């Protein structure tokens, strides 16, 4: 079986145990030599003779799928599958799998690290100290504040656990929320609008789909508390970035941290 392997962390020389397992399964592996997500025009010649595809963050469009007559399965190396044209894969009878929860601890911990960095203004104070300014700023104490978690899946639960350790009040919104889990762990269940209005910190852990695209829009932002900290550790398209920019400009937010942006090539830092 010939398999294309494109995730950058699964390339030779990275010491990946997962790659060793894959090598034991197939001796005909094709690797991503560009060390970045591949475009559709780069994927097609690599995939055309492959039976399997372990996919990173490549653009797996209808054009790619239709050009691959031998492809039998697409396995996403990660939880998200928004870069895969699911309808095209289904039409061609190609199953698409993912690995939910594979990096839940890492992303949940990163989310809380970002919350701490923003609440205590660590990047700002680091820069000011390096510039010889020695600004005195205590930031915001998290104890007793309310964190609203949108998406209480594997990652959201890690973030909630971290927040509980800081004695924060934890509330959550999820269309498929596990009420028994919330009751056991002291997590308040809220509707979307309620969470937006009540939270001092909002953490996004949602998949990107039609129902979540621009979920955080101008109306949602207008209903947030002044100075809300918004952390997006899911997908860029969940936030209307133009509306978020305006909110920052008008000082409605304390900070928006976007770990994922809609179009990376268009971002200016």
PLM-predicted stretches and their roles:
Residues 92-94, 99-146, 150, 161, ...:
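Phosphate-binding beta-alpha-beta segment of Rossmann-like dinucleotide-binding domains, i.e.
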Residues 1-50, 264:
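N-terminal glycine-/charge-rich "phosphate-binding" loop or analogous flexible N-terminal tail
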